[in-house]
């Protein structure tokens, strides 16, 4: 069931730093493989320590982000969780639980990689954005 318009999803994807260099046409390619979902309060979207396979973009509602059982953040519509899961298999660093009725969409690693395999230009742009993010967040200036 389609919960969101194409434009809503494209605008949300555009705000994700990993996708900042993508054109509207390329964002539409990603939008087409996203699944629209709705869950009730208490539903766990991802659990700390488990390998992540999905990236979540929140549209309406609120989630709690917890590490080692302690709340570290609250996220709402427009926020996103799990972009690293699109790139590599790593354990989740936090548990994310719906606090209110939640509407969101999901992009899986498998579908994302299929788009990258079919479109090397998108892959290059995503890798550039990832490298830029790593450079910005690196606290060691000798890693340049």
Residue positions per predicted region:
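Cytosolic regulatory regions built on CNB/CRP/Popeye-like sensor folds
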Residues: 1-144
């Amino acid at each position: 069931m389609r919960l969101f318009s194409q434009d809503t999803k494209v605008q949300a994807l555009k705000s994700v730093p990993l996708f900042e260099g993508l054109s509207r046409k390329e964002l539409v390619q990603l939008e087409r493989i996203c699944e629209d979902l709705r869950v009730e309060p208490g539903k766990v979207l991802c659990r700390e320590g488990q390998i992540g396979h999905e990236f979540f973009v929140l549209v309406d509602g609120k989630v709690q982000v917890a590490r080692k059982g302690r709340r570290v953040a609250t996220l709402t519509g427009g926020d996103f969780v799990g972009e690293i899961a699109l790139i590599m298999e790593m354990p989740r660093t936090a548990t994310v639980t719906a606090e209110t009725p939640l509407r969101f969409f999901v992009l899986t690693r498998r579908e994302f990689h299929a788009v990258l395999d079919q479109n090397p230009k998108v892959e290059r742009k995503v890798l550039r954005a990832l490298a830029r993010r790593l450079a910005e967040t690196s606290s060691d200036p000798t890693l340049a």
